[in-house]
Amino acid sequence: MNHSKRTNLPGILLLYTLAFSPNNAWGQYDRLWIPDTLSGTTFNLSIRDSSAQLRPGNLTKTAGVNGKFWGPTLILNKGDMVYMNVYNYLPDTTTLHWHGMHLPAIMDGGPHQPIPPGTLWQPYWKVTNNAATYWYHPHLHMMTVQQMTEGIGGFIIVRDSQEASLALPRTYGVDDIPLALTSRSYDASNAFAVYNNVNISQYGDYMLTNGTPNAQVSLPKQYVRLRILNAEIERGYNLGFSDNRTFYIIANDGGLLNSPVAVTRVKLMVGERIEILVNLGGDAVGSSLDLKAYNSGQPYGFPGGEPITSGLNGSLLNNIDFSVLHINIVATTSNPVTTMPATLANNTYWTAGDATVSRTVHVTGGGTDSAFSFDYTPFSMGTINKTVNLNTIEKWTIVNNNVFGHTFHIHDVQFMQFEHRI
């Protein structure tokens, strides 16, 4: 079997010093930047240092994929073989992890697949995932926080025949909008403040949506689809609209739900994705509303719910409600989606009774090198902590014994959460 390849790159020095064009006007709002798309079966991705005008004054040092912050949205089709050419022009080693994708471990892009400076990594795999919103991001051990803070990452949208058969909004950038939610803090020179001490929070003081501060977008007077990703280091979001309108969850990390779920609030934790439909058909052209984080008054342990604004675990966004996107209503498109399907998919879910193996995993304090560990065991790159047999169904009980809330994600596979107790 041919494995992913790494080759040295020719000596090229490129310095990007570009203003982040959507944010050059410092009014109340700035136009939401929507990433370009790449489609096909071969994708060329270059990771470089750059700089962007995120605040008045000095440029902020950033890093991005094929640009100055974040990266292009990759459009993949279920059943295709896809080939990635990942060029690392950074001065540091990095990785690129395909978050949520089912693929061979050697193609995963986790800490065990480093890409040294000046080299090319060429993973490939057959797309077997259902249509959904996924993403890619760096995952180098002890460098993930810094490289994600600088802006490396991007969306992946998988399409399939089931999703294509439904009358859903899918005109990218018009009625189908990707939203990466992050926050950042800055020092006096406008550099990103990155805290490498794992026992200090990574909560940012200022909201960035797709890298845009004070983001606003124009959306048509019809059903609109928002693909929302929590791309934070730590913060959670309790999302809803400023008029408390009902919206509908149609998909999550694993793909389409069986039917839309009506809500007025939804919590989104780090790395998690949802797709929602919101009906703007009854809104007047020229009116506006906000997608907001209703993060005030959250229970103890909610990431970003701490009632402190500075110091350890402090942030100006902690324990308050704030806008993540200002929405202006414009005229309908020429072919609007005006109704919502009652049925989306026919998923069959396992139950706890289907499991033949049960495990209990405790989330515990990690000591000086990490705020978290599993079962009091420090992480080791050379250690296999759990061995799972292929084609078995397991029930895992995750018990968080830590004082902080934390998300849980397994590379390569999806899992069904059937109970959650606090």
Model-found features: residue ranges?
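Bacterial Sec-dependent N-terminal signal peptides
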Residues: 1-28
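Histidine-centered copper-binding motifs that mark active-site loops
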Residues: 26-277, 297-299, 309-367
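Short glycine/proline/serine/threonine-rich loop/turn segments at secondary-structure transition edges
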Residues: 131-135, 283-290
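Active/binding-pocket-proximal capping segment
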Residues: 243-255, 401-422
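Long, structured stretches of catalytic cores involved in phosphate-ester chemistry, encompassing
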Residues: 270-274, 283, 296, 391-394, ...
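Ordered core of a single globular domain
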Residues: 272, 277, 285-287, 400
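Sequence/structural signature of beta-propeller domains
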Residues: 288-305
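C-terminal substrate/ligand-recognition segments
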Residues: 359-417
